[in-house]
């Protein structure tokens, strides 16, 4: 990591703000003119995420939805009347992106379930998200309401209803569905299990013609290598463990995931480098969702999972349903501890192999489900990636600039630079030293709206009340004891 203190000077213009006391105008304008919707992060350490470096003692000025100035504190003036955020000893990085979550019913209002998910995401520093499932009408409605400024939440990209063996019957219907979903305004397609090869190929061909990315699961009929050749982005490492088995092993035909069973003993990790290199060459993105699978196979047991502090923000009915689901999945929960460990370790090895080969990773939580609470689950996934051997910068990259690049928006957000959308995360400690520091949040800015620690705590409290949780004494975002700055 390089530590830098200088940067090309830019004009100190201002940027957007969501807090009381907006400022006055930039000095280049008449002093009497107000610098409306302007906020300056003063004397802050910037983690720009354009490379592995740290810019010490910077001032970052934001106006509207954009960063308009970034430079050394002694050379970057703060517009007169701009709202100032103290940055000394703090770290400013791009907001996080959850590239695999599910929306729930609602319109995005604070009192409904969808609104609660939005609040939990923001309170944990997630300013962009990709929804890969949820009620058909909810996803586009909430996405558009956020975009219009009617409700506050991360910028959303939403997938169409999943294409699978029950929703499409044959190649022609697959093509028709793709055209329908494009016309309906969905941002991408999701594929699930049980698609035959011919139907899959028709879907992928039409998706390319319509300019829609496809993400999702890998079925035995399709296979990992054909999915890679087709350009599908892969969720959950689907198909990778299957490919670690000997060529003639019947367990290769299990749908997407070889679970915690006897076939694990026959897997050959020596196959991982070739799989990773094939992924890199194909330019395919992967969202491993390590934390979800490690939660499901956790040796600590369901009762321990029920003590997670973030469950305060989940409805008790959801917690009970998750408990029952794990209790009913005997293969996952009753497997020997050694087999669970091997399952988790093989997934870590595949993920580490992908990173080492230069294949692109994304952070995806697959929340809210199975003790994975929206927002909080992003931090669990980042920490799981770190535990898999991905260095801090690589994890942060997967959670920021990689997501923007995957969506074709690398010049819009995902880094801290002049002209970028002001989706920012202000931290109390350096995330390049430990990704756990992304939990220690002093404030979040989403599209130029500033949410200080006090407002994030208020959002969490409102969510907890709706979830019928008891009041909390110590406030914080991703830990139960972090305090407001």
Regions found by a protein language model. Name each.
Residues 183-187, 195, 245-388, 472-485:
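Active-site neighborhoods of metal-dependent hydrolases
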Residues 29, 46-59, 72-73, 373-376, ...:
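Acidic, glycine-enriched loop/beta-strand segments at the rims
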Residues 24-28, 447-485:
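Extracellular/periplasmic ectodomains of large secreted or surface enzymes and adhesion receptors
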Residues 44, 60, 65, 89, ...:
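Divalent metal-coordination and catalytic microenvironments
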Residues 26-37, 46, 51-93:
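Histidine-rich, glycine-flanked metal-binding segment
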Residues 87-101, 113-266, 270-310, 468:
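Divalent-metal coordination cores built from histidine and acidic residues
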Residues 1-13:
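Bacterial N-terminal signal peptides that target proteins for export
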Residues 20-21:
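C-terminal motif of bacterial Sec signal peptides marking the signal peptidase cleavage site
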